[in-house]
Regions:
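Short helix-loop-beta junction
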Residues: 21-35, 115-120
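Short histidine/acidic/glycine/proline-rich micro-motifs that form metal-
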Residues: 12-13, 97-102, 128-133
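Residues at alpha-helix caps and immediate loop-helix transition turns in enzyme cores, especially N-
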Residues: 18-19, 72, 106, 136-139
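Glycine-rich phosphate/pyrophosphate-binding loop and the adjoining helix
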Residues: 31-34, 48, 120-154
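Glycine/serine-rich loop-strand microenvironments at binding/catalytic pocket rims
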Residues: 1-8, 44-58, 141-144, 148-153
Length: 154
């Protein structure tokens, strides 16, 4: 059984739609590669170190507020950092962001945190500004598929 954890702070309809795309894409990817998937979704404010410790892969999503990740996702990282620091090395992950402007600060902050955790990024972060395009939908589907495959050890 492959466990995929999806952690997000979904304060807007577009972000909720992105999470829905991840959930459907993860199930489809698992079926396509013949993997039994235990998919767990958690709000960033309630996700825990135990959730991460039990996961084989993780995808997280955040709004970009004033050029930075949401406080909720930062809170999640603060809660899991020390318990997971030496226990989750090489955990495959991917992430997506939604905002109406530049996400460079959010990307830099997230990359710094997951770099310190020594997790393994399996695809470039997806940055969605304004609406979700068919291209953005496909890129998120592809990212999710890569995380599922990596979580399954493929």
């Amino acid at each position: 059984m492959t466990r995929l954890l999806v952690v997000s702070h979904t304060v807007s309809p577009p972000l909720a739609e992105l999470v829905d795309i991840v959930v459907v894409s993860a199930k489809n990817a698992a079926a396509e590669i013949g993997v039994d998937l235990d998919l767990r979704t958690r709000p960033a404010l309630t996700g825990s170190a135990l959730d991460v410790l039990e996961a084989d892969g993780i995808i997280f999503g955040t709004p970009v507020n004033i050029g930075y990740m949401s406080g909720a996702l930062k809170h999640f990282f603060d809660q899991i950092y020390y318990p997971c620091m030496n226990e989750t090395t090489s955990l495959p992950y991917g992430y997506f962001l939604h905002g109406n402007n530049d996400a460079a600060g959010a990307v830099a902050a997230i990359d710094t945190i997951v770099g310190a955790l020594k997790w393994r990024r399996v695809g470039a972060p997806l940055q969605v500004t304004a609406g979700i395009t068919p291209t953005g939908r496909q890129e998120l589907t592809d990212l999710t598929s890569r995380v599922v495959a990596a979580a399954a050890g493929l």
